[in-house]
């Protein structure tokens, strides 16, 4: 039985359920050295309930996890693998492990997540133990690098600290340019303000480090990108390098409407936990964005593909006069696909932009998301092209039209397969031929102000 009521009331239906694989991702920064029991979590979505089977080095570990629970390490509800790093180190010594996760929805195709590398380091034997101090104002590049005799540059400090060491920064400004160290580093090297140093007295300036696995903690990053200029604060090496940013801040000193500035560029594999991006044209494009705030950006506040965005917030997205602005963009042209995106637990407010522009996406979930508009006149969101295995669950977007693309020649038309919108609150939803699941699009248990067929 089915009932459709328009103009602001409930749409309820008994409809087909997903026939597609679960949508899931690790909520873990890889290559960590861990001890004790490390809670490695998976975030997963499907129209049906899911469960997760975990492996360590290819062997099944523990019981199948039937439901998510709060991971105290991340603050996120996850399917958790309690990785016994300490116990394994006691038995086998410190070493590398490969974690696996198989996400299963009853009667559907399971999904094997990409393998995750971690290091059991219960005995503390892995990686460099060296701590190097740097002082850009009073240091000496040929000094010993200890507290009383710091080096001058970040490049020298990173080299001396070694693979997995620690760099302490005293007050001053430090460049990311040409830090060196190559692409074969195995462990995260920590870079952080020295004990007792106010983070606001340490300034990290834009550059291309040219090395791998730098872990920045409690630092402020800046670029100086003026009108007509293009730049990134932290540049990658075409996908060969990764960086982890814990409680770090990113900004363009000239403001969001100046140059075309990005927090990350050239395919840096970025992992962002905590911190804030503000007064810069673009938000951070990261593989993992957890607990991060994005404020006062011009456009593209969040990643559009190949990312887990969880428990983040966005406030004040507005382009310069005459320019366009979109919160989330995920677009591909055949034969390529965009997507592989999870956005969960997002609160976005102060939006004067299109909320999303999606074309030819698959394997995406938008769950427990609220969008609050500051201004929306003449603006709309759209979904176009082939759209496969996409779930909108408990999404609130009132006051902006969502266009499911339709054209006279059929090019770029919305062609859904296993697309579900449930428990959502929308404004105008236009362009849908059928919403009962019979044509690949299932809208249920939702409130829609106006629906145009």
Task: Please give the residue ranges for each predicted region.
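Right-handed parallel beta-helix/beta-spiral solenoid domain characteristic of secreted/periplasmic
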Residues: 184-238, 244-255, 316-319, 344, ...
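Short, compositionally biased P/S/T/A/G/V-rich stretches that sit at domain boundaries
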Residues: 19-40
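Surface-exposed, short loops/turns at beta-strand junctions within beta-sandwich domains
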Residues: 86-96
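Aromatic sugar-binding surface patches on proteins
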Residues: 70-87
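All-beta strand scaffolds that present successive hydrophobic residues in beta-strands
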Residues: 190-191, 215-218, 243-245, 263, ...
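Short, T/G/N/S-enriched strand-turn elements that build extracellular solenoid repeat scaffolds
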Residues: 154-161, 174-184, 201-210, 233-235, ...
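Residues in short coils/turns that link rungs of repeat/solenoid architectures in beta-rich domains
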Residues: 223, 252, 257, 270, ...
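Right-handed parallel beta-helix/beta-solenoid
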Residues: 116-156, 173, 194
